[in-house]
């Protein structure tokens, strides 16, 4: 009894010890609207049938995705924070669909991705659910409508581009799991850089960053958003979140055999102790974060040299804060969520999946995928 009770404490101690390797803070700057967003998102997902009962709701609630949203958007409240919380919640529900057989069936994954993309192509004012779509797609249609409605076209195009990169990464991960890509499944150890190129998309950070613009009441010009140094700062934000997530989720992913983890890849390549690989990845995260802060300190002068007006200075400052909130907020959530502690590991061990992990009609998708032509992989795979 005593030994069993100590296991969660030991797992939490390991997580906190690893988190202490990061030189940047774990944010506790939580939006005052977080508790309201917590209840809103559970009700929203429940309305579409994502949860089968009270136990499923309780398991989801223990993961506190609302806290992640509240740390990402500490100045947002009301409808804005509710939308951010719904996006984060949907992300993780969607991600959990791939923990079983579906994640190793590229044809089925491609069809699911195509179904989600189809919704992004609909007229947001007149899009209608199709028969048999199910909770995942029906909830996404509602989410997409609320994200897109009333936004500037330049922002909508930006968000959709990032969203498609995120979606296509699931297909590429499935191809890698089955050795269907050149170099995948071979004898040569994978590289951290190659895994990172894919994880920058699958981590889903860029759409979360995009929401900072409508929440803050501004839209960055494409040349500024996509130019130096902002594009590189966004990539550094991706990398810090990826490395943080890979360290926080390491025990869970070792338990389920997930290979898309930079720590595991570093361990495969370098050998030695697992904790040596953890320290190496933490060092990479720290270097990215230091570069980010050094560049952020130079930004006002760079903008002045470029002739930026006060409004642009203010918008860029808000966006830089948004990137910082995502990096530090992700770490703050990672050390307090049940997703990465003993409960989180046991919840996906031994073939078990989350109660909401069967929303895709995976068996039908898998059957439909056999022998049928695939939709195109799209431009989202690989590095930007």
Swiss-Prot record:
Pfam families: Terpene_syn_C_2 (PF19086). Mg(2+) 2 binds at residue 95. Keywords: Lyase, Magnesium, Metal-binding. Signal peptide: none annotated. Mg(2+) 3 binds at residues 245, 249, 253. GO terms for molecular function: metal ion binding; terpene synthase activity. Binds 3 Mg(2+) ions per subunit. Its cofactor is Mg(2+). It catalyses: (2E,6E)-farnesyl diphosphate + H2O = (+)-isoafricanol + diphosphate. The keyword Aminoacyl-tRNA synthetase does not apply. Its EC number is 4.2.3.157. The keyword Lyase applies. Mg(2+) 1 binds at residue 95. It is an enzyme of class 4 (lyase). Belongs to the terpene synthase family. NCBIfam families: isoafr_syn. Catalyzes the cyclization of farnesyl diphosphate (FPP) to isoafricanol. This is Isoafricanol synthase. It comes from Streptomyces violaceusniger (strain Tu 4113). The lineage of its organism: Bacteria, Bacillati, Actinomycetota, Actinomycetes, Kitasatosporales.
């Amino acid at each position: 009894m005593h030994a069993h009770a100590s296991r969660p404490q030991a797992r939490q101690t390991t997580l906190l010890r690893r988190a202490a390797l990061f030189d940047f803070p774990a944010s506790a700057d939580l939006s005052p609207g977080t508790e309201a967003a917590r209840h809103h998102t559970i009700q929203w997902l429940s309305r579409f049938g994502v949860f089968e009962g009270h136990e499923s709701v309780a398991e989801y609630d223990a993961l506190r995705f609302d806290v992640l949203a509240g740390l990402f958007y500490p100045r947002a409240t009301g409808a804005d924070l509710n939308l951010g919380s719904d996006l984060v919640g949907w992300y993780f529900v969607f991600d959990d669909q791939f923990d079983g057989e579906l994640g190793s069936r590229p044809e089925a994954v491609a069809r699911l991705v195509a179904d989600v993309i189809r919704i992004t192509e609909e007229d947001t004012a007149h899009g209608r659910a199709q028969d048999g779509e199910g909770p995942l797609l029906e909830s996404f249609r509602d989410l997409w409508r609320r994200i897109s409605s009333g936004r500037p076209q330049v922002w909508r195009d930006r968000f959709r581009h990032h969203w498609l990169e995120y979606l296509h990464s699931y297909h590429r991960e499935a191809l890698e799991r089955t050795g269907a890509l050149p170099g995948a499944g071979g004898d040569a150890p994978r590289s951290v850089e190659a895994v990172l190129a894919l994880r920058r998309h699958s981590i889903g950070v860029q759409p979360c960053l995009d929401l900072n613009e409508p929440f803050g009441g501004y839209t960055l010009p494409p040349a500024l958003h996509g130019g130096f140094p902002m594009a590189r700062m966004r990539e550094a934000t991706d990398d810090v979140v990826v490395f943080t997530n890979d360290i926080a989720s390491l025990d869970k992913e070792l338990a389920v055999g997930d290979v898309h983890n930079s720590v595991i890849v570093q361990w495969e390549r370098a050998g030695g102790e697992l904790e040596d690989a953890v320290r190496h990845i933490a060092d990479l995260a720290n270097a990215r974060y230091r570069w980010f802060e050094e560049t952020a300190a130079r930004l006002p002068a760079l903008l002045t040299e470029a002739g930026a007006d006060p409004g642009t200075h203010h918008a860029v400052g808000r966006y830089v804060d948004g990137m910082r909130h995502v990096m530090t907020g992700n770490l703050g959530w990672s050390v307090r969520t049940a997703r990465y502690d003993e409960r989180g590991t046991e919840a996906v061990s031994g073939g078990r999946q989350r109660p909401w992990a069967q929303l895709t009609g995976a068996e039908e998708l898998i059957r439909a995928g056999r022998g049928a032509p695939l939709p195109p992989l799209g431009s989202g795979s690989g590095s930007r």
